[in-house]
Amino acid sequence: MRLLLTLPLLLSSGFALPAQAQRPYVDPLAVTGRMAAAACPEPEIVQGGIPRTREYLTTITKCLDKSWSKHLAGTRRTFRKPIVRYYDEPAPRVCGLDWPEGAAAFYCTERATLVFPLTGRWIEDRTDLYPLKVAAHEYGHHVQSLTGIRKHYESAAARAGRARRAELGRRYELQADCLSGVFLGSVWGSLGRGRGDWEALLDATRASGDDDGERRSHGKGANRAYWLKRGFTTQRPGSCDTWPAPPARVA
């Protein structure tokens, strides 16, 4: 059992890879094309001073279900919605493991479960677009599981040394960032959001990088923003193939 975490804020596949970046899987998303534009009725995360985080995330998750089920319909893979769990406060254990310290949200791989704490700095200190992005990122891990990317990544990581295993993990997380951008780009026109909102979200994403931390799990802020923007701009999951990217792009 693995937990794929989102921590709180404090290229094409047709060429040979450098040895340090060896691809664990031929990207099955490359042939799926552009995600269709869709409407996602974004509710207020706070209404009349009352936090409505659960209602907000429930609505967004339904949008993610709809968009990804439609997009993956032609991949010959069975689409299954993830289970969604909400917690008003951290529990001693979740998905059979200890609650991960400092996690904003996470995906339980074997149980295909999205876990959202409903309190904390990730909710309180950010634009409501950041919870939207976090939900889309964790859903990206669900897509990686559905398409077989996760299984092949874990197989490659199990055979790798410490440094390469960490790099593979960042490639995996940055791909989820990019997939979140694909979804955001596909629904952006329905959100009534402007350029300033997008820039604020990019700034929050840059600030969520692990540039200064000992734990190098999700990538530098600049790289997180790069992959988010790449997915948002192209709206093509195939553009999120982080596995052949140069090491500097996944640092």
Identify the residue ranges that each predicted region occupies.
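A metal-dependent hydrolase signature that marks the N-terminal structural subdomain at the beginning
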Residues: 3-95, 232-246
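Pan-zinc metallopeptidase signature
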Residues: 30, 206-251
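Second-shell loop/turn segments in exported
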Residues: 46-57, 119-130, 161-170, 191, ...
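Short helix/loop segments within enzyme catalytic domains
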Residues: 59-61, 65, 72, 171-209
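Active-site recognition of the HExxH zinc-binding catalytic motif
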Residues: 68, 133-146, 177
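Surface-exposed patches in mature extracellular/periplasmic domains of secreted proteins
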Residues: 69-85, 151-154, 187-201, 214, ...
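Active-site scaffold of zinc-dependent metalloenzymes
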Residues: 96-129, 145
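Post-HEXXH active-site segment of zinc metalloproteases
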Residues: 145-173
